């Protein structure tokens, strides 16, 4: 039974049993800072289980794409070396939101697994576990399903604390939780391993295939378990694992999905064996990287993008190990789309983007390796002792993306040790910085306890009278806030826009009969809109009538920039192509910043085109319309949804420009007519990560100011080059070209002088035990010229050791060369190190060529004079 057939059968079975088939959610969790990537089927229903969201169905089934790489759930280093570890996997699941419970859930699982209409697995091969005190589940398995009691195992608190058990599931320290029952397949006594709960349970004999979680309690901060009024069910069965069982193989990499990918990888890599762990790594990583890119993640140095970058580079590194000499990952995408594109249409739609991103990242990695090798070489030249410091290893990895394992390979070649303890100290410090910055480290159940909601009125008004529902001093509720005290204010209604969708929160003032609260920012906390600031006069009390007034100037300026962002997005897609997608934005009163997916820098002509298109839409002065509709209707109208944003069942659709030039889902504040924007100008365009570009732009008065200052600067330049606005650019180009030409001529003169001086020095070489030895100083010569001159002298002298030094900017540069045959006894690296240390510096390199330097110039003559004796000592 093929993997695709198992997936279809699972969804069909539960659909027949009244479940809504829900599409897999994105691998990027929407509006959930606790989670790096979607790693379980229940992630998209988290708010439903917590009672914060309501769906129009109470039972659902999914095939959810998942990634476990980075963060708490990290399988990356095990991938390729075990039978069942993956960075990407599919989780089949069925869910009940207060509908059915234990009896139905257990019966559904058993019927699907064992019925001849479905998977038809031998019942005698199945063993189940239940939580030790879950008598209800035990009774259902034993007396209703008919599983022999000796194959029902009770698992207690086996992790050192109450309710800490393999068979008790918890969302966090507090919140929904409950027992679970797991179904295992017994491969038989000929396979090593014991049953669940036994000392040798980690063997391969008993393999877990399905986990059924019963959410029946709410755990409070005091550790008490309170029954939920509507218990729920969350189940999960890994597609790869059940496919291995159904296809009679013991490794997930032997199932049909992987076998075809492995064969394709072998072909692309010139026939490498599919048994190679390297190919299993590549087959796994092409799945996770491709799906992540399809869901909008791009390689970068922070957050989710850094994990993607690590996955891609790990795959590329393993490709290099089996002979890859050029980028190859992008060549595997077509086969992946062929295998999984029907089940996941977003993969097929993004094929071109995935291929380009992978190719670009592999090319960048090749450059990184080259740069990293040079940096490592430099660090080794400065090394004191035989151990590479942990900080150096960390910097190469963290700043330059240079793999730790590659640093280790080079260390072994040089007989050097690695300070991995120091590396771990640096890594932990980075993790601490990330936690303190709040990157994916927020506790979902922590924060303000706000049990009230606010209505936003700011689309139609910027001021009004409302009621103060709640006050907070820090995270503590307060009855009043007094003068000078910082805090938070929640109103029943408010015209203040809470930060969202890249638009900053409003500022302004809240006034009561007894005081004034200055609002510095506005944010959303659950269903409440929170005004952040401080009391500037008197005091503010709960229950008072509050006159709220938004800073009109800042709101208007922000609206200009937000509306311009929509026009910019549409213009970029028109000029660059439909692959352009928003990756992030910042909209405030001063400017707009827009990050978007694109694979190369924009040309000046493309920037000019985009500016012209946006300004044409501004001059058209068309009205901006908003309409609230269902998500399906919005999609039919062509509205763009933005990466990383969370949308409800109904959405606000914003249309602007001629012939609906731009249609997007947006809850932000905007101009009434495009002409209100006034003017649009792009101030800069640059890259922020591989495949991501950033535009910073201005509108209205700031745009006019920018144009005027740019014009004044151009006039100043024209005067300096004795031209005018029309000829200034050509004159500057001519000056630059002339400067380059003069620099070349200066370098040539320096090289000739060095060569001439070197030729003269050849006569000064001393015979040391049949070897010509020359140590001398050349004035006014840079390091490159020194190296060229050393090569010339080696060729001229024959069997020779040459060391030359020059002084520039208060530092001595040293280059040494030894002819090939003699470098076995006299090593250039050792020679440079000996001389550099006398000058208070460092040096090193290859046996035939090395370089270094020092700062104690007064010792240079003595250091050069010591060379002959040192060489004699090396020759013995």
From Swiss-Prot:
Binds 1 zinc ion per subunit. InterPro entries: aa-tRNA-synth_II/BPL/LPL (IPR045864), Ala-tRNA-lgiase_IIc (IPR002318), Ala-tRNA-ligase_IIc_anticod-bd (IPR018162), Ala-tRNA-synth_IIc_core (IPR018165), Ala-tRNA-synth_IIc_N (IPR018164), Ala-tRNA_ligase (IPR050058), Ala_tRNA_ligase_euk/bac (IPR023033), DHHA1_dom (IPR003156). One of its GO terms (cellular component) is cytosol. SMART domains: tRNA_SAD. It holds the Pfam family DHHA1. Its EC number is 6.1.1.7. Gene3D superfamilies: 2.40.30.130, 3.10.310.40, 3.30.54.20, 6.10.250.550, Bira Bifunctional Protein, Domain 2, Threonyl-trna Synthetase, Chain A, domain 2. Its cofactor is Zn(2+). Its main location: cytoplasm. It catalyses: tRNA(Ala) + L-alanine + ATP = L-alanyl-tRNA(Ala) + AMP + diphosphate. One of its GO terms (biological process) is alanyl-tRNA aminoacylation. Zn(2+) binds at residues 562, 566, 666, 670. Catalyzes the attachment of alanine to tRNA(Ala) in a two-step reaction: alanine is first activated by ATP to form Ala-AMP and then transferred to the acceptor end of tRNA(Ala). Also edits incorrectly charged Ser-tRNA(Ala) and Gly-tRNA(Ala) via its editing domain. Consists of three domains; the N-terminal catalytic domain, the editing domain and the C-terminal C-Ala domain. The editing domain removes incorrectly charged amino acids, while the C-Ala domain, along with tRNA(Ala), serves as a bridge to cooperatively bring together the editing and aminoacylation centers thus stimulating deacylation of misacylated tRNAs. PANTHER family: ALANINE--TRNA LIGASE, CYTOPLASMIC, ALANYL-TRNA SYNTHETASE. NCBIfam families: alaS. This is Alanine--tRNA ligase.
């Amino acid at each position: 039974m093929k993997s695709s057939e198992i997936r279809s059968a699972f969804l069909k079975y539960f659909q027949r049993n009244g479940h809504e088939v829900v599409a897999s959610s994105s691998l990027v969790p929407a509006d959930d800072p606790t989670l790096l990537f979607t790693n379980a089927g229940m992630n998209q229903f988290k708010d439903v289980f917590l009672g914060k969201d309501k769906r129009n169905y109470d039972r659902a089934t999914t095939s959810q794409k998942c990634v476990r790489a980075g963060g708490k759930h990290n399988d990356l280093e095990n991938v390729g070396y075990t039978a069942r570890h993956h960075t990407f996997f599919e989780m089949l699941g069925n869910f009940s939101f207060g509908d059915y419970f234990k009896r139905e859930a257990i019966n559904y699982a058993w019927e699907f697994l064992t019925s001849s209409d479905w998977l038809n697995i031998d019942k005698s091969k199945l063993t189940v576990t239940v939580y030790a005190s879950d008598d209800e589940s035990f009774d259902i398995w034993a007396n209703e399903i008919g599983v022999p009691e000796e194959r029902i195992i009770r698992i207690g608190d086996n992790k050192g604390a109450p309710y800490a058990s393999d068979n008790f599931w918890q969302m966090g320290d507090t919140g929904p939780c409950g027992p679970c029952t797991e179904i295992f397949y017994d491969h038989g006594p000929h396979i090593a391993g014991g049953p669940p709960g036994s000392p040798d349970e980690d063997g391969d004999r008993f393999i877990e295939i399905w986990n059924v979680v019963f959410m029946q309690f709410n755990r409070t901060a005091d550790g008490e378990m309170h029954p939920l009024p509507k218990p729920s069910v969350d189940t999960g069965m890994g597609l790869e694992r059940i496919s291995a069982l159904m296809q009679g193989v013991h490794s997930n990499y032997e199932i049909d999905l992987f076998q075809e990918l492995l064969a394709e990888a072998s072909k692309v890599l010139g026939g490498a064996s599919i048994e190679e762990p390297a190919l299993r790594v590549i087959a796994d990583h092409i799945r996770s990287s491709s799906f992540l890119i399809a869901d909008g993640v791009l390689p970068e140095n922070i957050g989710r993008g850094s994990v993607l970058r690590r996955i891609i580079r790990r795959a590329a590194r393993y490709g290099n190990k089996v002979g890859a000499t050029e980028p190859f990952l992008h060549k595997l995408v077509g086969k992946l789309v062929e295998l999984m594109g029907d089940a996941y249409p977003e993969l097929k739609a993004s094929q071109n983007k995935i291929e380009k991103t992978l190719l670009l990242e592999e090319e960048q990695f090749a450059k990184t390796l080259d740069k990293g090798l040079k940096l490592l070489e430099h660090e080794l030249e400065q090394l004191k002792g035989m151990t590479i410091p942990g900080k150096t290893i960390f910097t190469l990895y963290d700043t330059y993306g240079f793999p730790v394992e590659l640093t280790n390979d080079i260390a072994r070649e040089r007989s050097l040790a690695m300070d991995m303890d120091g590396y771990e100290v640096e890594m932990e410090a980075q993790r601490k910085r990330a936690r303190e910055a709040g990157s994916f480290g927020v506790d979902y159940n922590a924060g303000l306890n706000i049990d009230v909601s606010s209505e936003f009125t700011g689309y139609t008004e910027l001021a009004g009278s409302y009621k103060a529902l709640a006050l907070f001093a820090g995270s503590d509720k307060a009855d009043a806030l007094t003068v000078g005290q910082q805090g938070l204010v929640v109103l029943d209604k408010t015209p203040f826009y809470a930060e969202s969708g890249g638009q900053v929160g409003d500022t302004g003032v809240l006034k009561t009969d007894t005081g004034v609260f200055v609002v510095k920012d506005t944010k959303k906390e659950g269903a409440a809109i929170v005004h952040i600031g401080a009391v500037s006069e008197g005091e503010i009390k709960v229950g008072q009538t509050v006159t709220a007034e938004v800073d009109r100037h800042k709101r208007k300026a922000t609206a200009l920039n937000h509306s311009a962002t929509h026009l910019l997005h549409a213009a970029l897609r028109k000029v660059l192509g439909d692959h352009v997608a928003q990756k992030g934005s910042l909209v405030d009163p001063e400017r707009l910043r827009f990050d978007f997916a694109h694979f190369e820098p924009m040309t000046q002509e493309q920037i000019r085109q985009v500016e012209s298109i946006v300004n044409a839409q501004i001059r058209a002065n068309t009205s901006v319309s908003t309409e609230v509709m269902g998500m399906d209707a919005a999609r039919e109208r062509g509205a763009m949804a933005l990466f990383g944003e969370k949308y409800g069942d109904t959405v606000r659709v914003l249309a602007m420009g001629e012939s609906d030039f731009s249609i997007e889902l947006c809850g932000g504040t905007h101009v009434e007519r495009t002409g209100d924007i006034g003017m649009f100008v792009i101030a800069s365009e640059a890259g922020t990560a591989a495949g991501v570009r950033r535009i910073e732009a201005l509108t209205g008065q700031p745009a006019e100011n920018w144009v005027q200052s740019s014009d004044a600067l151009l006039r100043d330049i024209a005067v300096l080059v004795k031209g005018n606005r029309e000829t200034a650019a050509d004159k500057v180009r001519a000056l630059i070209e002339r400067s380059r030409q003069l620099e070349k001529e200066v370098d040539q003169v320096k090289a000739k002088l060095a060569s001439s001086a070197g030729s003269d020095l050849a006569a000064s070489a001393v015979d040391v035990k049949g070897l010509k030895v020359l140590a001398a100083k050349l004035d006014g010569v840079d390091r490159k010229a020194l190296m060229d001159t050393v090569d010339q002298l080696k060729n001229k002298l024959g069997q020779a050791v040459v060391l030359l030094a020059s002084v520039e900017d208060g530092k001595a540069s040293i280059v040494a060369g030894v002819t090939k045959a003699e470098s076995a006894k006299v090593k250039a690296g050792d020679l440079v190190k000996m001389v550099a240390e006398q000058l208070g510096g460092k040096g090193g390199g290859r046996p035939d060529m090395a370089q270094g330097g020092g700062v104690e110039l007064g010792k240079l003559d003595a250091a050069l004079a010591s060379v002959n004796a040192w060489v004699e000592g090396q020759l013995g």
